[in-house]
Amino acid sequence: LLRRQRQMCIRDSIKGIDAAEKISILSSICFGCKILNKGFIVEGITNITIDDINFAKELGLKIKLLAISEKIGNYIKQRVHPCLIPSSLDIANINGVINAIVVDGTPIGRTIYEGEGAGKGPTTSAIISDISSIMVGNDDFSFGHSPKTKKHFKRYNFNKHECKYYI
């Protein structure tokens, strides 16, 4: 049973499902909105080949699965897909079970947070934190916001989405 669960977790990571769930929760925390768990692009790394990796390396780039969320006016634009990023960036060197969060905002500028995103320790820590909050009566403020104060944003229309693509 544990082996099957581990295989499912790996599959979810490769397909981008795990990253999509994490960015949905982070968007809710950052923007004070309901969790957006559908209506956005989710593309994993299953179609990345060794040739893609080698070509990126020749260009001084790395391929990373990124989960991106941004607020544009009254819209939340959320997506998960492989990206080519310069090898010199800090997040290009995040590997294994380590996850990184890059926050770019005013007035703080760009900050990076990193830590384990999988395994017994991080999962246990998150569960204990949630249980502690509920035990002290703080169950109305999941993700730092009361359900009564959650903002309603529209989902971004990806038919309007423009970006560079590697073919």
Language model features: what each stretch is:
Residues 8-9, 45-63:
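Active-site loops and adjacent core secondary-structure elements that bind or stabilize anionic groups
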Residues 1-10:
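Single conserved hydrophobic/aromatic residue that forms the stacking wall/gate
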